[in-house]
């Protein structure tokens, strides 16, 4: 195909991607996500098209900047970065232009500046050492062992068989297994070596001969060259002022060692054959059927256990984190003393006092010999912001997003990407597991310092049924994510029909043939490029029952709490006797006490009594005007993308009198609040349903209280730290901050686009 034809074909594909972002035509909506996938497949099958596509995408980015078409900037940035991660042969001039474009975007508001900064950091790394992004991604995702880059990632795919059909579960499992059967460690190491040499040597690299040589090499030889290439790139990336010439010479030595001395820059055939494609292997994915809220914690601990330095016992008790000093105000894990307590067992000279002013004397007030040392972890280490990585502009070059050293000597080398498939009910169960995990961290602080946790969501809804039997809307959160992030809508929300179509297809028993798994490719794209979290407030509800012998219970919800009025009544000597003078009618007499959300952020308590047939408390904004920074919501001490207002919809009964007698009608009233208490004032009982889940239903309720769920690790009480100053005269008193709300992050491509 001529170069002009190639450019025209790629230009048409890019325009198709842009059109689906700019129109809501049903004809285009049916193919949403497919255009982006086919565009990447074109350059994957023919890597020589990559520079042409990068130029086209850069031209469209500059056009969007000049015409202020901001809605296409982030999708185009993600597209070009995905191409650059795989590509070789991109000129320095193209890298510089894209880098300059990203730096210009830093003046724009979030999320544009956030995404642009992340892209600029990765571009700078790739410009300094070509091939670094590809190499690090493959090593981390495939868990290839290397001392110079020890980071590991794993994708945990959770599906609840109660919410997703068995055919869908089987189809997804077969597609994942078929793809991973072709991705052995040897294959991935060949890809890393081949990509690094082609990226550094360019046209001087005989790609076909290199590919054949690597295919014929035994595992031991392959591992030798793999570690040599990784060492060359990582040492080059760690230098303050890397020498491009020295880097190329070092990789040329490896190349000549593979193919022989004649394969230098001037060696080889003058006419090169078409270079073979170097695919980017899909990440290592483990498939799990959801069994309960404890499963997430256990799987994450098992992920850490094999190669970590944590000493995890059978009951998941934690460990002594080495390298922590008490004078850094760090928490105290229980450390079992090895001191026998007998004076003669002390080493010689142990009872001699150190010289005044020596380091040992300065630390004397901070240590004691023997006994059980107990530390309380500082508040900042236990917050979601420090756990999942600060949600903003802070990224570290060469490390997965959110990773780094939280504690001295403790690095977060593991990244767990938890992907859940299902509807709103599955998200409610995930919120329960997330809350349970955070509570465990207050007692067993083993995941936080070692693990970066990223949450992802792909909606899988049941096929549409007739209107008479259709369930309530179960894709509310997915609809919200698609509304605030158009690229999520285009790539993720459109996967549901494709997943059901895959489940209807007969399984293929031939695993030897190479296929293009569309669903797995889109999942992989979302996992890699979805780096911007949207934070959702988790709410806690305290429930009181009509049976006074039954203790109140507490639960949490993420999306919705629905209240229905039961037909049954509780006895007159129950929790709350029926008031006299209350007219009979539909519904129940309710007392509502809530804190009204005001523009001034001043607390204002409102108490009202009314007759209602039901209530719904919604935690997800219903429209774009309620997203991020609404004037009716008090601003929380958290990222600007938080949502901490409940939308309360009350179906109120209105009594009217006319010539025919008394009649009743209903009207829906809506207000917004953060905290609310609701109590039945007559003999009617209530039924509560959390997150639309039939398994999370509470009956015979007379009163309940709803408030933002606090971060389990935070508190308002005082704690005294028995650490003295150098003179041993003062006691430090640490006052914990006001409890922070517990926010659950779900990763998207851009966060909230205003």
From Swiss-Prot:
InterPro entries, sorted: PIK3R5/6 (IPR019522)
Entry's Gene Ontology BP terms: angiogenesis; G protein-coupled receptor signaling pathway; immune response; positive regulation of angiogenesis; positive regulation of MAP kinase activity; positive regulation of T cell differentiation; regulation of natural killer cell mediated cytotoxicity
GTP-binding as UniProt keyword: no
Protein name, entry field: Phosphoinositide 3-kinase regulatory subunit 6
Species in which this protein is naturally found: Homo sapiens (Human)
Subcellular location: Cytoplasm; Cell membrane
Disulfide bond in keyword set: no
Single GO term (MF): 1-phosphatidylinositol-4,5-bisphosphate 3-kinase activity
UniProt function note: Regulatory subunit of the PI3K gamma complex. Acts as an adapter to drive activation of PIK3CG by beta-gamma G protein dimers. The PIK3CG:PIK3R6 heterodimer is much less sensitive to beta-gamma G protein dimers than PIK3CG:PIK3R5 and its membrane recruitment and beta-gamma G protein dimer-dependent activation requires HRAS bound to PIK3CG. Recruits of the PI3K gamma complex to a PDE3B:RAPGEF3 signaling complex involved in angiogenesis; signaling seems to involve RRAS.
């Amino acid at each position: 195909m001529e170069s002009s034809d190639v450019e025209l074909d790629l230009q048409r594909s890019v325009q198709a991607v842009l059109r689906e972002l700019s129109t809501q035509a049903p004809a285009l909506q049916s193919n949403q996500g497919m255009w982006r996938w086919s565009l990447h497949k074109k350059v994957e099958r023919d890597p020589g098209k990559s520079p042409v596509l990068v130029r086209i995408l850069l031209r469209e980015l500059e056009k969007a900047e000049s015409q202020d078409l901001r809605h296409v900037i982030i999708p185009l940035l993600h597209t070009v970065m995905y191409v650059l991660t795989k590509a070789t042969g991109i000129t320095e001039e193209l890298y510089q232009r894209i880098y300059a474009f990203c730096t210009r975007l830093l003046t724009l508001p979030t999320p544009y500046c956030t995404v642009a900064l992340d892209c600029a950091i990765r571009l700078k790394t790739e410009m300094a050492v070509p091939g670094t992004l590809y190499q690090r991604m493959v090593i981390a995702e495939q868990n290839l062992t290397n001392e110079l880059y020890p980071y590991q990632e794993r994708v945990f795919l959770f599906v609840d068989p109660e919410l997703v059909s068995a055919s869908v579960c089987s189809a997804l499992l077969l597609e994942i297994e078929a793809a991973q059967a072709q991705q052995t460690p040897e294959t991935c190491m060949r890809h890393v070596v081949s990509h690094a040499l082609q990226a550094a040597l360019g046209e001087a690299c005989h790609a076909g001969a290199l590919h054949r040589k690597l295919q014929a090499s035994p595992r031991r030889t392959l591992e030798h060259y793999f570690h040599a290439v990784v060492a060359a790139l990582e040492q080059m990336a760690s230098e303050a002022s890397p020498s491009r010439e020295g880097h190329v010479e070092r990789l040329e030595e490896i190349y000549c060692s593979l193919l022989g001395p004649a394969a230098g820059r001037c060696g080889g055939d003058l006419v090169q054959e078409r270079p073979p494609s170097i695919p980017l292997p899909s990440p290592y994915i483990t498939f799990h059927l959801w069994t309960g809220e404890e499963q997430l914690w256990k799987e994450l601990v098992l992920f850490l256990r094999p190669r970590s330095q944590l000493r995890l016992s059978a009951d998941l008790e934690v460990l002594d984190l080495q390298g922590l000093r008490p004078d850094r105000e760090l928490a105290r894990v229980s450390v079992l003393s090895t001191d026998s307590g007998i004076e003669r067992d002390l080493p010689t000279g142990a009872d001699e006092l150190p010289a005044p002013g020596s380091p040992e004397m300065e630390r004397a007030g901070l240590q004691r010999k023997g006994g059980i040392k107990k530390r309380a972890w500082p508040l900042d280490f236990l917050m979601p912001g420090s756990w999942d990585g600060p949600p903003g502009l802070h990224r570290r070059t060469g490390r997965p997003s959110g990773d780094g050293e939280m504690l001295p000597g403790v690095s977060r080398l593991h990244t767990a990407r938890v992907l859940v498939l299902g509807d709103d009910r599955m998200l409610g169960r995930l919120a329960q597991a997330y809350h349970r995990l955070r509570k465990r961290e207050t007692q067993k602080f083993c995941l936080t310092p070692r693990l970066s946790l990223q949450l992802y969501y792909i909606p899988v809804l049941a096929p549409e049924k007739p209107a008479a039997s259709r369930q309530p809307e179960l894709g509310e959160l997915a609809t919200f994510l698609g509304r605030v992030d158009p690229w999520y809508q285009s790539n993720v929300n459109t996967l549901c029909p494709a997943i059901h179509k895959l489940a209807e297809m007969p399984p293929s028993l031939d695993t030897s043939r190479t296929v293009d798994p569309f669903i797995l490719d889109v999942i992989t794209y979302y996992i890699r490029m979805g780096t911007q979290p949207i934070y959702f407030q988790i709410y806690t509800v305290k429930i009181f029952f009509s049976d006074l012998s039954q203790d109140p219970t507490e639960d949490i919800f993420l999306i919705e709490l629905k209240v229905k009025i039961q037909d049954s009544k509780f006895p007159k000597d129950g929790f709350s006797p029926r008031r006299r003078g209350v007219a009979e009618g539909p519904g129940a007499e309710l007392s509502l006490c809530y804190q009204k959300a005001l523009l001034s952020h001043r607390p204002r308590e409102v108490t009202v009594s009314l007759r209602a047939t039901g209530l719904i408390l919604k935690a997800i904004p219903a429209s774009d005007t309620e997203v991020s920074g609404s004037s009716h919501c008090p601003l929380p001490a958290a990222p600007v993308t938080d949502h901490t207002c409940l939308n309360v919809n009350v179906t109120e009964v209105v009594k009217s009198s006319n010539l025919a007698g008394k009649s009743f009608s209903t009207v829906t009233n809506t207000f917004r609040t953060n905290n609310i208490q609701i109590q039945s004032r007559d003999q009617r009982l209530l039924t509560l349903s959390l997150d639309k889940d039939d398994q999370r239903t509470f009956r015979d309720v007379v009163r309940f209280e709803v408030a933002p769920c606090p971060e389990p690790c935070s508190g308002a009480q005082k704690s005294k730290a028995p650490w003295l100053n150098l003179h041993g005269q003062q006691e430090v008193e640490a006052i914990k901050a006001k409890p922070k709300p517990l926010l659950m992050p779900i990763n998207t491509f851009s966060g909230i686009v205003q």
